[in-house]
From Swiss-Prot:
Described function: Catalyzes the reversible interconversion of serine and glycine with tetrahydrofolate (THF) serving as the one-carbon carrier. This reaction serves as the major source of one-carbon groups required for the biosynthesis of purines, thymidylate, methionine, and other important biomolecules. Also exhibits THF-independent aldolase activity toward beta-hydroxyamino acids, producing glycine and aldehydes, via a retro-aldol mechanism.
Residues the UniProt record annotates as site (Plays an important role in substrate specificity): H228
Obligatory cofactor(s): pyridoxal 5'-phosphate
This protein's name: Serine hydroxymethyltransferase
Principal place of residence: cytoplasm
Pathway note: One-carbon metabolism; tetrahydrofolate interconversion; Amino-acid biosynthesis; glycine biosynthesis; glycine from L-serine: step 1/1
Catalytic activities: (6R)-5,10-methylene-5,6,7,8-tetrahydrofolate + glycine + H2O = (6S)-5,6,7,8-tetrahydrofolate + L-serine
Organism of this sequence: Shewanella sp. (strain W3-18-1)
Record-listed N6-(pyridoxal phosphate)lysine modification sites: K229
UniProtKB keywords: Amino-acid biosynthesis, Cytoplasm, One-carbon metabolism, Pyridoxal phosphate, Transferase
Biological processes, Gene Ontology terms: glycine biosynthetic process from serine; tetrahydrofolate interconversion
Length: 417
């Protein structure tokens, strides 16, 4: 018999302790992984609701199970809010992740073996944009494009490659690029060769929703995103379009269900609905602008301290610190900073001589620290501490000093105040 007072602490202390330790880690560590963020208690409330019990294969009004009248309301709210947020005429909120959303786009628009133009992973792309170890690289003929010597996307080279190889689909979007992407230019190139333009905006969706980064939805045939990262919602995916093409919309829906998934996660879709509503609030725009301001402030200090930033700066939420030429790998930098309670991730940089498991760079992002309330002053102070460690990564005294400073700063800015 189920009772409301059942809890994990009494029943499964081993698991409970792991959860508590992770909660403490989040409170006592500064999170700088560009793809991570803190979601709101409202989103977590939705995800912990009894919606988790309901199977709802199909779409609102067209379910394969009974008892879906209320989950239909939930999913419709999420769909309509997503459309409003990004100026779309179509939204599918069922993908369990960004990668699931991306695989649905491939399935809807392509056949195995078709040619696809995607950003080189080593230049800032994503696994699902054609990496040989991913389904995208295994099933499709991937032609990569990259960045030029200045660290910016080379659109002339992109056009040359597109005309030469005539891909059926071009992919815009990134996981480690700090510039502004010219979506209109990419659509112009796609139209020249009769290709689909597919944009994966996962990293910058929150910035786009707030109007502080260009919106790809008016330019692309189809756009995908995660619902966490800068959007600060639950872990999941979404597919959007403003193509006014009902045939395309049907293909996308079929590629999600039954093509790639069965029952949707209704508790997560409820979390998405809450997050989209939060993103429509005026304070969300203030938050996203601060995300960019904090990233620019961090870049300023890195450059002052003599560190190279790929592309020389940032126009979004992230930066890539290039350690080529220094006696320090990305893996070592990641570990040293982690010892001081600063969480980053090692990341390959353009022309990286080291393997992806070692790398010559670290990727840093500001969504999570901004969510805690950091402004430019705290971001600059933090960057100074990071540089202190990178300057002397094998010095335990430096690491201990910075760790103490980090703990004090975290206490001033709790994740959930």
């Amino acid at each position: 018999m189920l009772k409301k007072d059942m809890n994990i602490a009494d029943y499964d202390p081993e698991l409970f302790n792991a959860i508590q330790n992770e909660t403490l880690r989040q409170e006592e560590h500064i999170e700088l992984i560009a793809s991570e963020n803190y979601t709101s208690p409202r989103v977590m409330e939705a995800q912990g609701s009894q919606l988790t019990n309901k199977y709802a294969e199909g779409y609102p009004g067209k379910r394969y199970y009974g008892g879906c009248e209320y989950v239909d309301v939930v999913e419709t709210l999420a769909i309509e809010r997503a459309k409003q947020l990004f100026g779309a005429t179509y939204a599918n909120v069922q993908p369990h992740s960004g990668s699931q959303a991306n695989s649905a786009v491939y399935m809807a628009l392509l056949k195995p073996g078709d040619t696809v133009l995607g950003m080189n992973l080593a230049h800032g792309g994503h696994l699902t944009h054609g990496s040989p170890v991913n389904f995208s690289g295994k099933l499709y003929n991937i032609i990569p494009y990259g960045i030029d010597e200045s660290g910016k996307i080379d659109y002339e080279e992109m056009e040359r490659i597109a005309i030469e190889h005539k891909p059926k689909m071009m992919i815009g979007g990134f996981s480690a690029y700090s510039g502004i992407v010219d979506w209109a230019k990419m659509r112009e190139i796609a139209d020249k060769i009769g290709a689909y333009l597919f944009v994966d905006m996962a990293h910058v969706a929150g910035l786009i929703a707030a109007g502080v980064y260009p919106n790809p939805v008016p330019h692309a045939h189809v756009v995908t995103s995660t619902t966490h990262k800068t959007l600060a919602g639950p872990r999941g995916g979404v597919i959007l379009s403003a193509a006014d093409d009902e045939d395309l919309y049907k293909k996308l829906n079929s590629a999600v269900f039954p093509g790639g998934q069965g029952g949707p996660l209704m508790h997560v879709i409820a979390g998405k609905a809450v997050a989209f509503k939060e993103a429509l609030e005026p304070e969300f725009k203030v938050y996203q602008q601060q995300v960019v301001n904090n990233a620019k402030a961090m870049v300023e200090v890195f450059l002052e301290r003599g560190y190279k930033i790929v592309s020389g700066g940032t126009s979004n939420h992230l930066m890539l610190v290039d350690l080529i030429g220094r006696d320090l790998t990305g893996k070592e930098a990641d570990a040293a900073l982690g010892s001081a309670n600063i969480t980053v991730n090692k990341n390959s940089v353009p022309n990286d001589p080291r393997s992806p498991f070692v790398t010559s760079g670290v990727r840093i992002g500001t969504p999570a620290i901004t969510r805690r309330g950091f402004k430019e002053a705290e971001s600059k102070e933090l960057t100074g501490w990071i540089c202190d460690i990178l300057d002397d990564a094998n010095n335990p005294a430096v690491i201990e000093r910075v760790k103490g400073q980090v703990l004090a700063l975290c206490a001033r800015f709790p994740v959930y105040g």
